[in-house]
C-alpha cells in the first residue's frame, strides 16, 4: 500500500464498462417463470363464483377527447371518460364476478381498495392452481381477466390503475355498497385548507 506524505495527492481511476455491456441479453425469455394461474394445488374458495349475484364488465380503453379542459387521448372505462364512468354498485353479501378487459395499448396494474379478489381466468384459460388471491392485478394490453369476490366490506371504494399518472388522467372508478353515502362530492372547493 502506498502512503502519501502530508499534502500529497493521489489520482485514482475506476474501470468503466464499454458501450453495450449493459444491454439486455438477446433471445427468448426464460421458460421457468411462475404462472400463478396454474401454480400450486386447488383449494375451496369459501364461495361459489358460478352463483354470482352481481356480474360486471370493466373494459379499459382509450379515446380522443377532453379531460380537465385539455385535449388528448384519455383512458376510458366501458367507453366512458372520467367522471362519467360507471360506478359498480353491490349489496353486502353479494358474490361479484367481474371481467376486466384491456384494449388501451398499455399495461395497467389495477387495484381495488377494501377487498381481495380471486382470479378465475386469464384470456379464457381457467385457473387450475391454488386460489390466486390479490388486491392488485397487472392487466397487460390485450389481456382479459375474470375475477370474483364477496362484497363483505361496506363502503365506497376506489378501483383504479396503480400507475398513478393513469389514475390522475381518469382511469378510476368506484365500488359502492347500497345504503352507503358520503358527504363528499367531486369538484368544487375543498373543505380542508392544507398549509
Model regions and ranges:
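Extended terminal and domain-junction accessory segments
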Residues: 1-97, 101-104, 152-156, 163-195
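Short beta-strand and strand-turn-strand segments in soluble, beta-rich domains
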Residues: 80, 125-132
Amino acid at each position: 500500500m502506498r502512503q502519501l506524505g502530508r499534502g500529497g495527492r493521489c489520482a485514482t481511476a475506476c474501470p468503466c464498462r464499454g458501450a453495450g455491456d449493459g444491454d439486455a441479453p438477446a433471445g427468448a425469455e426464460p421458460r421457468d417463470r411462475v404462472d400463478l394461474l396454474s401454480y400450486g394445488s386447488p383449494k375451496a374458495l369459501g364461495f361459489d363464483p358460478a352463483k354470482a349475484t352481481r356480474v360486471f364488465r370493466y373494459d379499459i380503453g382509450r379515446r380522443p377527447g377532453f379531460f380537465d379542459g385539455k385535449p388528448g387521448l384519455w383512458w376510458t372505462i366501458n367507453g366512458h371518460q372520467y367522471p362519467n364512468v360507471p360506478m359498480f354498485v353491490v349489496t353486502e353479501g353479494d358474490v361479484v364476478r367481474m371481467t376486466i378487459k384491456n384494449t388501451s395499448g398499455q399495461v395497467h396494474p389495477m387495484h381495488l381498495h377494501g377487498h381481495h379478489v380471486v382470479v378465475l381466468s386469464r384470456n379464457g384459460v381457467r385457473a387450475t392452481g391454488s386460489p390466486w388471491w390479490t388486491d392488485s392485478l397487472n392487466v397487460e394490453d390485450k389481456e382479459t381477466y375474470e375475477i370474483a369476490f364477496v362484497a363483505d366490506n361496506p363502503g365506497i371504494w376506489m378501483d383504479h390503475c396503480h400507475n398513478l399518472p393513469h389514475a390522475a388522467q381518469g382511469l378510476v372508478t368506484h365500488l359502492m355498497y347500497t345504503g352507503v353515502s358520503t358527504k363528499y362530492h367531486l369538484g368544487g372547493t375543498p373543505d380542508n385548507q392544507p398549509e
